């Protein structure tokens, strides 16, 4: 996930399935599923129903995993230390990938349909988006909003933890977020760096961290496990269908905003269940370790490939193009990630963001 490396990667009294072979294979799998969902959700040609389901959970999942990755000691660290560590881990990549996106935009903004899309916009407008950190104004690469958004979320959680323990913090934040969703009008005036949606996102962050420190894990097997899975799947599908297309980045919480949190929670539970059932693999590990590279670069890679295809006369995109473009974005990140980690690891916020257990080196 897009988060600082752990200070102590040992889980606190973990259930046995969560850690295998010296790595958190459970986390690797969940991060891998999450980043693949992000790419699939942004590639053209995706069926509308699939996009609706992906958007119902993919960004809340990332906030949840970021909270899970926060070690208990760092949750209690002084605010200054949290500010410096989180700034290095998130804002340095934000600056770097914004610069990469700006160069790509300047090189391609006058090509094809992009000429009309970006008519009247210049570098000053792009820099304005960088300052606000809002997806709608980061037109050169809208996904970059997540970097400042997670930065604010982590700082907000750090402040709350000065007052409450993990369980009480989760309860207080959940009540406040649900009250906001239930009793406030639709978001019209956006605040920079996701300061408005941070109150919603931090609930998932707090839930992830509470799950880690509590070591809670339901013990189901056989028919009970399958029945629980079917109930959660049915609830998720029903809630997502009721909600329609949501988008946390744009403060769009669906047709019934109060259902945004439970719908995302059901989706997260399904991903976690799937993650625990997957065997460890080098592919999942690679996707997990390089999610920080895939996340900001996949829109540029997809745009480059789709633009090239259109210049060759490719027609409207369907499911096959959707799959191929998604696969291209993931495969193209293999050499890019290697180059970045080999030569300029500093731009990723740390020499290595993989979950390496203490003493393994």
Which ranges hold each PLM region?
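Membrane-interface helix-boundary motifs at transmembrane edges
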Residues: 75-85, 158-169, 212-224, 276-286
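Central hydrophobic cores of alpha-helical transmembrane segments
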Residues: 169-180, 225-234, 291
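Alpha-helical transmembrane segments and terminal signal-anchor/GPI-anchor hydrophobic tails
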Residues: 11-12, 219-285, 300, 316-318
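Hydrophobic alpha-helical segments with transmembrane-like composition
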Residues: 54-55, 62-63, 69-71, 101, ...
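Juxtamembrane loop-transmembrane helix junctions in multi-pass integral membrane proteins
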Residues: 19-25, 43-53, 82, 191, ...
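C-terminal "closing" transmembrane helix and its immediate cytosolic amphipathic cap
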Residues: 2-13, 278-288, 301-361
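Kinked, hydrophobic transmembrane alpha-helices enriched for aromatic residues
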Residues: 21-48, 58-61, 65, 88-109, ...
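Residue-level signature of transmembrane alpha-helical entry/exit and packing/kink sites
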Residues: 56, 81, 89-90, 142, ...
């Amino acid at each position: 996930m897009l988060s600082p490396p752990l200070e102590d990667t040992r889980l606190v009294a973990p259930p046995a399935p969560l850690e295998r072979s010296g790595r958190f294979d459970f986390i690797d799998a969940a991060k891998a599923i999450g980043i693949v969902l992000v790419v699939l959700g942004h590639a053209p040609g995706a069926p509308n129903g699939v996009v609706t389901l992906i958007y119902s959970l993919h960004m809340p999942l990332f906030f949840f995993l970021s909270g899970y990755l926060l070690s208990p000691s760092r949750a209690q660290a002084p605010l200054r230390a949290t500010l410096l560590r989180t700034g290095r881990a998130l804002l340095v990549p934000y600056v770097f990938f914004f610069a990469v996106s700006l160069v790509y935009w300047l090189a391609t903004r006058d090509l094809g349909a992009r000429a009309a899309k970006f008519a009247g916009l210049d570098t000053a407008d792009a820099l304005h988006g960088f300052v606000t950190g809002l997806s709608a104004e980061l037109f050169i690469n809208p996904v970059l909003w997540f970097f400042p958004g997670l930065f604010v979320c982590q700082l907000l959680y750090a402040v709350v933890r000065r007052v409450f323990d993990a369980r009480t913090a989760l309860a207080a934040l959940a009540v406040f977020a649900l009250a906001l969703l239930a009793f406030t009008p639709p978001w019209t005036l956006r605040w920079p760096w996701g300061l408005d949606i941070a109150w919603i996102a931090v609930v998932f962050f707090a839930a992830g961290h509470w799950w880690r420190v509590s070591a809670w894990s339901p013990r189901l097997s056989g028919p009970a496990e399958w029945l629980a899975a079917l109930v959660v799947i049915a609830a998720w599908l029903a809630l997502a269908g009721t909600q329609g297309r949501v988008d946390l980045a744009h403060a769009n919480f669906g047709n019934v905003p109060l259902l945004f949190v439970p719908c995302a929670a059901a989706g997260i539970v399904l991903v976690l269940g799937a993650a625990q059932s997957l065997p460890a693999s080098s592919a999942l590990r690679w996707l997990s370790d390089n999610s920080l590279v895939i996340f900001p670069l996949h829109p540029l890679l997809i745009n480059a490939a789709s633009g090239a295809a259109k210049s060759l006369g490719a027609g409207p995109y369907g499911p096959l193009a959707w799959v191929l473009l998604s696969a291209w974005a993931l495969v193209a990140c293999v050499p890019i990630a290697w180059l970045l980690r080999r030569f300029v690891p500093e731009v990723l916020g740390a020499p290595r963001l993989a979950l390496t257990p203490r003493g393994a080196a």
